[in-house]
């Protein structure tokens, strides 16, 4: 029974923290409208940027990252050894929030947060990959997907083998949620950062 509770509670904490839709909350509070009716309809920072409010997009990015970071750190403190469960649940919460009928974001910023919390070297590789690909291509989705795929590889190479399975699973989730972006990349029609499409 105790084992079941110690598995369930980290999942609940991770999911609840991860499911807070900061992008939607911030755009509504600042009068920017319903983010789900803007641009791609996604609740993440890239779509917030399409409102023309760069500061709001940066705040969304940091808060989405921060909730993933917080979920893992809190669970590590209370239930040592269960941080991978919290990481999984936090990203799932962001992508499938119950409050928004399970229609959330694509998990890139939150995955960066959990990567940093699991082991900062993994998070550093994630950030450098994301920003590097974004800088070179100016395509947000390509940067995010590249970083997600690199994360489990970095975990394996840097000696964090216990985190490889959860990071690999989350990378697959991120790729799945970007399937429309992948189709547009192949067609050469994926919008670049700054586009309002």
Curated annotation (Swiss-Prot):
EC identifiers of the protein: 2.3.1.275
Main location (coarse class): membrane
GO biological process: phospholipid biosynthetic process
Record has Cell division as a keyword: no
Keyword Membrane: yes
An example Gene Ontology CC term for this record: plasma membrane
Keywords: Cell inner membrane, Cell membrane, Lipid biosynthesis, Lipid metabolism, Membrane, Phospholipid biosynthesis, Phospholipid metabolism, Transferase, Transmembrane, Transmembrane helix
Record-level Gene Ontology MF annotations: acyl-phosphate glycerol-3-phosphate acyltransferase activity
Matching PANTHER family: GLYCEROL-3-PHOSPHATE ACYLTRANSFERASE-RELATED (PTHR30309:SF0), INNER MEMBRANE PROTEIN YGIH (PTHR30309)
Record's subunit section: Probably interacts with PlsX.
Protein family per UniProt: Belongs to the PlsY family.
Protein name per Swiss-Prot or TrEMBL: Glycerol-3-phosphate acyltransferase
Provenance organism: Novosphingobium aromaticivorans (strain ATCC 700278 / DSM 12444 / CCUG 56034 / CIP 105152 / NBRC 16084 / F199)
Gene: plsY
């Amino acid at each position: 029974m105790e084992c079941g509770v110690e598995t369930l509670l980290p999942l609940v904490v991770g999911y609840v923290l991860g499911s807070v839709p900061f992008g939607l909350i911030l755009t509504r509070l600042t009068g920017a409208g319903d983010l789900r009716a803007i641009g791609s309809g996604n609740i993440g920072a890239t779509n917030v940027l399409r409102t023309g409010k760069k500061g709001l997009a940066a705040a969304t990015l940091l808060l989405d990252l921060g909730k993933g970071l917080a979920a893992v750190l809190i669970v590590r403190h209370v239930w040592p050894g269960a941080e991978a469960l919290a990481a999984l649940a936090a990203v799932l919460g962001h992508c499938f929030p119950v409050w928004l009928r399970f229609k959330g974001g694509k998990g890139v910023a939150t995955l960066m947060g959990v990567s940093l919390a699991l082991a900062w070297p993994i998070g550093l590789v994630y950030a450098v990959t994301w920003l590097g690909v974004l800088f070179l291509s100016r395509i947000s989705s390509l940067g995010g997907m590249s970083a997600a795929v690199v994360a489990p590889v970095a975990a394996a190479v840097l000696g964090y083998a216990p985190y490889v399975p959860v990071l690999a699973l989350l990378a697959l989730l991120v790729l799945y949620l970007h399937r429309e972006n992948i189709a547009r990349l192949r067609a050469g029609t994926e919008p670049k950062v700054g586009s309002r499409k």
